[in-house]
Amino acid sequence: MEPIKAQLSNGQIVDAYPLTQAQQFMFFAFNNYGQVPATLNIGTGEYWKGDFDTELMREAIAEGIERTECFRLRFVKDQQYGTLQYIVPKTEAVIEEVDHTGLTYDESYEIIKSWSTVGVEFFEKPLNTIKIMHLPEGLNGIYVKLNHVTFDGYSTKIFLADIMAIYLNKKVGAPYPKPMKPYLDMVQEELDYLNSDKCKEDQAFWINFFQTQSEPYFCDYLRDNRLMKERVEYNQPDRRYVQCFTQKTESRQLIYHISEEDTNAVLAACNERDMSVVGVLMLGLRSALSAFNERQEDVSIRLMLARRSTLLEKKSGGNRWQMFSVRSIVDEDKTFKEATEVIEKSRDVVYHHCNYPFLKWVYLKNSVNKATLGQTYDSLTFSYHAPIELPYENAEVKKSSIGIWYNNNFSMQNLYLTIKHRCADNGFDVIWEYKLDEDGAAEDVAILHDKMFKAIMMGAKNPDIKIGEILDAIKL
């Protein structure tokens, strides 16, 4: 990949590169449904109890930044190419140390959370920051605020794991982590795909797929159903999509901590009955959506995909996330186990063709359906974060660890569900981020959560239970 010579505002010439499709989508979504700079913030912290060496952590962070090229990513405006990206070869990053030991835990949490709500100047400026934290209750660790055009949830976790491994190498002689992979190699792979036979094959597949499928159906998470209202408003009794994307971005979170016992019950059922964890979680979610929509059998969920299968993709950082609709039509006579197979089959179709650019995918989908850009058949987005082991000094330190994702108070998604595992005990943390522009959203999301996990636990306890029995138990 030949670099593009780009000129910065100070006259300096840098080697720059085009944006990937995933980055272009982030810009598209931000410009159309975001526009508040903090919308692109990822704020997260990892904290633990026990002996903590601040200076060794400072050294580890500095090495981690040098090893992870996307932390040093910058963007520049170019008259010919629009927005380009370039890497600062060496950065003297300011690693601030913050002492909150004199505060309560809640006071500290609110202050740290407020950092995540502050946007940064985008072009030709550092986009990512990291702080060494000393918290109440004997907790120490690191907080990062990263830009979503430079990191996604997966690469954020890998970056933190790399720093913690370097720290343990310095502190107790643990093995030094293997090298990270070059970010630009991943960019090259993404750009090469666009001109590849595989891209042409994927496009042909999706064209045929949409032409041979019936129109999907919008299943709302609001009890004041938007589809029913739009059918009346537009005098379209057969309408199956909704106009629900707006530039109102203010959001809040509802967070639920599922017990280690219940989480282990779900994982055990998956292992014993050969069900995928993400399939079981999605079936619980689709069951709750079905219950909210008069037991609708045709449910679509927008699934966020990390696209990190190769070593290069796992260790190169950056943002590779794309999202695709996973549609499942499940009749009530199917068992829970059989219904997971329906979801997994639909999900596998997406996985095999998930490198195709999402915006082009939406165009192909809408070209054979009635929805247009800004209208959707998916009421929410779901992301499952499989466990990524973070290194700790010993089991006691690991048990004390706390990982926190701080809401930036802004979202481009109407409803975004993330389910991840706690480092301390591997239990599920369930994070619902909802927008404030819909009355009653918080109450409805809380009800949706209860019904989702009731369905999940019923299926984990008895994978042979009928879907109709689950819907009877979780009906509104």
Segments and roles (model prediction):
Residues 61-76, 268-315, 460-467:
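Hydrophobic "lid/gating" helix adjacent to the active-site nucleophile
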Residues 14-31, 106-111, 156-157, 249-265, ...:
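AMP-binding/adenylate-forming domain of the ANL superfamily
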Residues 3-25, 29, 33-42, 54, ...:
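Acyl-thioester-dependent acyl-group transfer interface
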Residues 38-43, 71-76, 118-132, 172-180, ...:
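Flexible, Gly/Pro-enriched loop and linker segments at secondary-structure and domain junctions
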Residues 1-34, 59-103, 126, 182-251:
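Short amphipathic alpha-helices and their capping loops
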Residues 65-145, 150-154, 161, 165, ...:
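Acyl-thioester-dependent condensation/acyltransferase catalytic cores
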Residues 11-17, 129-185, 442-458:
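Active-site-proximal acidic secondary-structure segment that organizes catalysis
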